[in-house]
């Protein structure tokens, strides 16, 4: 390795310090940023120091074509990428799924290998674990899941030593304001569609460069090509929010409004599709007291849930995009102060905040049902490239990259440069 290549790790570490400083300054005062920067640096240096003492004595290799690196072990249990895993395995590829452990586990199990390049102490632990992952699995393509991970830059550097590729798979649209979405240090960044690309391009702070690829969603397949809904079934599907949001006052008020509407409208059946991480205690209690409210089983897929509904109520769930793709008219109901990150108001009107507004929107949908179906589909294609072909297009793009070919002409790709 040349001295220039050796210095890549040091250069990357310096750039990461700069990026993390800018992230802090976006939210905190100068003094607050200084305190937090040095607090984080001390924690990282401790991890780096201990990592140097806990390098693996030997590494048993299990080479694969694709390594799917999830953000945490608990994410594997949610099986969000089961369709992608099955599709790639059916094509005959060797795919291994693993997750980023906590620092304590990395140190205890010696999941560390010396980084190929000179790395400052602060980032030694990150670089050493990234080097261990690449040495252990020897993937031809690493599929990364975790937004904002400080492992990503060092995974990319280590992979390049083996002429391998880092692909980041967006697991939702990238239209939200999360600071983690400033991380852009990947070879390829597979995005849902045009709205995601536009949102990333507008960001003032991006670390690293990538090739953004509009593959569509790898979680969407032809199961969302549903027949037009039947208005006469009078069934509304509520898309639940995550457990963290369920604790917030604005979302609790939204749930209460929807429950009150259900109580006053017994001729409509109300189905609740829970967030994968939520036990939906509010709706479980509502289902016990209201005959027209049901919480759907966890194992029921989103496509199966949508098939049972004539329209969908969304608050702040990414699943509204699949609802639109399935041609289900949308009622955007939200009593929180959160920004409408999905641009629902542009398609479905202002957020519904009262019973009167909600009932008026129901009547609007009933009055011109075919037009509302088309409006929902236009909304979906605003966010999704390739519609229900997202899984197929993702697999196709990965096959092309694996074979060293240029991406197909019908899959748009755009260079996404760094800003610092």
Where are these regions (language model features)?
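Active-site and donor-binding regions of nucleotide-sugar-utilizing enzymes
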Residues: 1-24, 38-220
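C-terminal amphipathic helix plus adjacent low-complexity
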Residues: 2-23, 361, 366-420
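Conserved catalytic-core segment of nucleotide-activated headgroup transferases in glycan assembly
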Residues: 77-80, 218-286
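Hydrophobic/aromatic beta-strand patches that form the interior of the parallel beta-sheet core
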Residues: 96, 143, 167, 188-190, ...
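Short, charged, surface-exposed secondary-structure boundary motifs
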Residues: 106-108, 176-181, 199-203, 222-226, ...
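Donor nucleotide-activated moiety binding/catalytic core segment of transferases
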Residues: 129, 277-326
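Catalytic binding pocket for nucleotide-activated donors in carbohydrate/polymer assembly enzymes
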Residues: 186, 207, 214, 318-385
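Short, conserved active-site loop motifs that form the nucleotide-linked donor/cofactor pocket
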Residues: 212, 292-294, 349
């Amino acid at each position: 390795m040349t001295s220039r290549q050796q210095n890549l790790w040091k250069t990357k570490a310096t750039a990461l310090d700069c990026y993390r400083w800018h992230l802090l300054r976006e939210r905190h005062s100068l003094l607050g940023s200084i305190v937090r920067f040095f607090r984080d640096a001390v924690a990282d240096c401790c991890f780096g120091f201990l990592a140097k003492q806990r390098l693996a004595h030997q590494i048993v290799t299990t080479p694969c074509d694709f390594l799917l690196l999830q953000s945490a072990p608990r994410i594997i249990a949610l099986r969000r990428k089961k369709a992608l895993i099955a599709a790639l395995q059916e094509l005959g590829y060797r795919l291994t799924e693993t997750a980023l452990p906590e620092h304590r586990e990395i140190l205890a199990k010696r999941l560390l290998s010396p980084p190929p390049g000179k790395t400052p102490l602060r980032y030694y632990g990150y670089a050493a674990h990234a080097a261990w992952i690449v040495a252990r699995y020897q993937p031809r393509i690493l599929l990364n899941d975790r937004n904002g991970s400080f492992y990503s830059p060092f995974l990319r550097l280590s992979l390049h030593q083996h002429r391998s590729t880092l692909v980041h798979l967006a697991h939702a649209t990238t239209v939200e304001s999360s600071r983690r979405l400033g991380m852009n240090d990947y070879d390829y960044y597979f995005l849902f569609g045009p709205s995601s690309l536009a949102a990333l391009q507008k960001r003032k702070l991006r670390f690293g460069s990538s090739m953004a690829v509009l593959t569509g969603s790898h979680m969407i397949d032809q199961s969302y090509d549903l027949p037009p809904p039947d208005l006469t079934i009078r069934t509304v599907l509520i898309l639940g929010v995550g457990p963290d949001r369920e604790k917030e006052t604005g979302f609790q008020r939204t749930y209460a409004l929807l429950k009150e509407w259900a109580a006053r409208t017994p001729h409509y059946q109300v189905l609740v599709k829970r967030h994968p991480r939520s036990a939906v205690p509010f709706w479980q209690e509502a289902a016990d007291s209201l005959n027209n409210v049901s919480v759907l089983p966890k194992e029921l897929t989103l496509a199966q849930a949508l098939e049972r509904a004539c329209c969908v109520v969304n608050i702040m769930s990414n699943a509204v995009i699949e609802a639109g793709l399935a041609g289900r008219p949308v009622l955007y109901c939200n009593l929180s102060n959160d920004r409408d990150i999905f641009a629902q108001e542009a398609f479905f009107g202002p957020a519904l905040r009262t019973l009167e507004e909600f009932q008026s929107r129901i009547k609007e949908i009933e009055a011109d049902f075919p037009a509302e179906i088309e409006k929902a589909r236009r909304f979906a294609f605003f966010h999704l490239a390739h519609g229900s072909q997202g899984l197929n297009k993702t697999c196709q793009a990965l096959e092309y990259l694996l074979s060293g070919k240029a991406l197909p002409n019908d899959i748009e790709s755009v260079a996404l440069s760094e800003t610092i």
